[in-house]
UniProtKB/Swiss-Prot annotation:
Protein name listed in UniProt: Light-independent protochlorophyllide reductase subunit B
Listed GO biological process terms: light-independent bacteriochlorophyll biosynthetic process; photosynthesis, dark reaction
Pathway: Porphyrin-containing compound metabolism; bacteriochlorophyll biosynthesis (light-independent)
HAMAP family: ChlB_BchB
The reaction(s) this protein catalyses: chlorophyllide a + oxidized 2[4Fe-4S]-[ferredoxin] + 2 ADP + 2 phosphate = protochlorophyllide a + reduced 2[4Fe-4S]-[ferredoxin] + 2 ATP + 2 H2O
Entry annotated with the keyword Iron-sulfur: yes
Segments crossing the lipid bilayer: none
Record text on cofactor binding: Binds 1 [4Fe-4S] cluster per heterodimer. The cluster is bound at the heterodimer interface by residues from both subunits.
Lineage: Bacteria, Bacillati, Chloroflexota, Chloroflexia, Chloroflexales
Residues that coordinate or bind substrate: 421-422
Protein keywords: 4Fe-4S, ATP-binding, Bacteriochlorophyll biosynthesis, Chlorophyll biosynthesis, Iron, Iron-sulfur, Metal-binding, Nucleotide-binding, Oxidoreductase, Photosynthesis
Annotated EC: 1.3.7.7
């Protein structure tokens, strides 16, 4: 566990809250100080649900530190009286875990009628993803019982959960495809599942677990313990979805169910057209212009692999780089992306990812909320394809990432992300139609003010010498620049107003790359201030 102000994963008890908030008649009680109840606020803010989060904080105050569990039995009794859950999950937060208290004894003293499970979510060993996956697997192991197989072919869907990335939409997409195939659903978990539903998991003919982050271990356990085969692929993209459907039919056939393949039009929203417009879109002149735009992809394991392959295989975009913050899935990501990238970036430090993006300057960044901030800093196009996310990625409309519908959604995101901003480009080219009049009025005129020629003095200190002064003339027809002496250490160049004005005339979609090239030129030649003449010199030398 380490302290950071931006993290890709939440704390361990945040992962516990995701499972409890996903299930019916299950409640989480956090043994935590007042400050650790922020988890409740996160779920209330982001989850598009009219229900209160299924979690309660048993507050440990400063005066309780020596006997912090004294309030826990009363809190558990209050939760049982108010909520009437089938199961209460008790967990210490990342702060109270330091007290090393025996929560089992405190829970027993409460004398509850419902079942109580004390879960050891040690933040020094796990974060959100591992905590959620481990808890869900433990629940499946605890409650799943041998069952007779359902009469008709049915499947379990494991993985959709509270605060999952487009999880509700992905579930709708999976339901649509299964209904088209004539396959019924036995249990969806943890989303909307009860303890009784977990008991029925072994009755299914097949388990579908599309996410590497949640549901994978539970699906593997059901296969090993009860012989329920598992389909662990994520149908992201048109071709992967076709392969996913074929694999599903094969596994059900091995279990004794012959599932006929309906016409592809049956998978479309109207039942008449192609299930996805991506193959057609990829052949149009619009998408032809994207074939040379490099993309950088970063996020969780499932979406990084799926989106990277989709961009490369189906939209024809070169992949400048890819990576994941889910370290325990790094080997799987490397295996899946062999041939797509030379090296997979594996890190949970956003500064490292930001530095890679700054070095690559790709035309499109596919990442998390953090990469959205980084891209904004460098004026790069960005679309969010993975958690962590902000509220704008918890949408009301149907926006899946899985299946044929998901392929159309991702293609739309790529297209609109890369082309939106034309208005900005037109304003740069033809003026702002008076939008900057108030700013110009500060100079005493509403008309455009031409910058007067000026001389800029650049000081480049040398060791054990008086600073050398180089004077650069801005006016003049030729971009002659007096080369200053090389500095002892690399300078961090500052943009002069005339250079910034000239940079704004560069089309926005390559402006970030031009800025980076010019700054690199300035460092190499020791220019502390980037003037218009320095910019022109860099353009001549580098083709910036």
């Amino acid at each position: 566990m380490r302290l950071a102000y931006w993290m890709y994963e939440g704390t361990a008890h945040h992962g516990v809250g995701r499972i409890a908030n996903s299930m019916r008649n299950v409640h989480a009680v956090f043994h935590a100080p007042q400050g650790d109840d922020y988890v409740n606020a996160i779920f209330a803010m982001l989850e598009r649900s009219p229900n209160f989060p299924a979690m309660t904080t048993s507050v440990v105050s400063g005066t309780d530190l020596a006997r912090g569990t004294i309030r826990l039995p009363d809190t558990l009794k209050q939760v049982e009286e108010r909520v009437h859950p089938d199961l209460i999950i008790v967990v210490a937060s990342c702060s109270t875990i330091l007290l090393q208290e025996n929560l089992e004894i405190a829970a027993q003293h409460a004398g509850l009628q419902c079942e109580v499970m004390v879960y050891d979510a040690n933040p020094y060993r796990m974060q959100e993803i591992v905590a959620a996956e481990s808890l869900f697997t433990d629940l499946v192991k605890r409650f799943a019982k041998p069952q007779p197989r359902t009469e008709r072919p049915t499947v379990n869907i494991l993985g959709p959960a509270s605060l999952g990335f487009h999880a509700r939409h992905d579930l709708i997409s999976l339901r649509r495809m299964l209904k088209t195939l004539g396959v019924e659903i036995n249990v969806v978990a943890p989303w909307g599942a009860s303890i009784a539903d977990l008991r029925r998991l072994p009755a299914a003919w097949l388990t579908i677990a599309p996410y590497r982050e949640l549901g994978l271990r539970a699906a593997t356990y059901l296969e090993e313990q009860f012989g329920v085969p598992a389909l662990l692929d994520a149908p992201i993209g048109v071709q992967p979805t076709l392969r996913w459907i074929e694999r599903l039919r094969e596994l059900l056939a091995q279990a004794g169910a012959d599932i006929p393949m309906p016409p592809l039009t049956a998978f479309s929203l109207d039942g008449l057209s192609a299930p996805s417009a991506v193959p057609w879109l990829a052949r149009t002149a619009d998408m032809d212009s994207f074939s040379g735009k490099p993309a950088f992809v970063f996020g969780d394991a499932t979406h990084v692999v799926g989106v990277t392959r989709f961009l490369h295989d189906e939209l024809g975009m070169p992949i400048a780089g890819a990576g994941t913050y889910v370290k325990h899935q790094a080997d799987w990501v490397r295996e899946q992306l062999a041939g797509y990238v030379d090296e997979v970036l594996v890190t949970d430090e956003f500064q490292t990812v930001a530095a890679r993006i700054a070095a690559l300057r790709p035309e499109l960044v596919c990442g998390t909320q953090m990469e959205r901030h980084t891209s904004r800093r460098y004026d790069l196009n960005c679309m969010v394809i993975s958690p962590p996310t902000h509220i704008e990625n918890h949408l009301l409309a149907y926006r899946p990432f899985l299946g044929f519908d998901g392929a159309d959604v991702i293609a739309d995101e790529v297209y609109t992300t890369c082309t939106l901003g034309m208005e900005k480009h037109l304003i740069d080219l033809f003026g702002d139609a008076g939008l900057e009049l108030p700013e110009k009025a500060k100079n005493g005129s509403a008309q455009a003010v031409e910058p007067a020629p000026a001389a800029v003095t650049v000081e480049s200190p040398k060791p054990e010498q008086e600073p050398a002064v180089a004077t650069v003339a801005v006016s003049g027809p030729t971009p002659a620049v007096a080369a200053p002496p090389a500095p002892a250490a690399p300078v961090d160049p500052v943009w002069a107003a005339d250079a910034e004005a000239m940079l704004k005339k560069v089309p926005f979609f390559v402006r970030g790359r031009v800025r980076g090239n010019v700054e690199r030129y300035a460092r190499q030649h020791g220019h502390a201030v980037i003037t218009a003449q320095v910019l022109l010199a860099a353009k001549e030398e580098l083709g910036a």
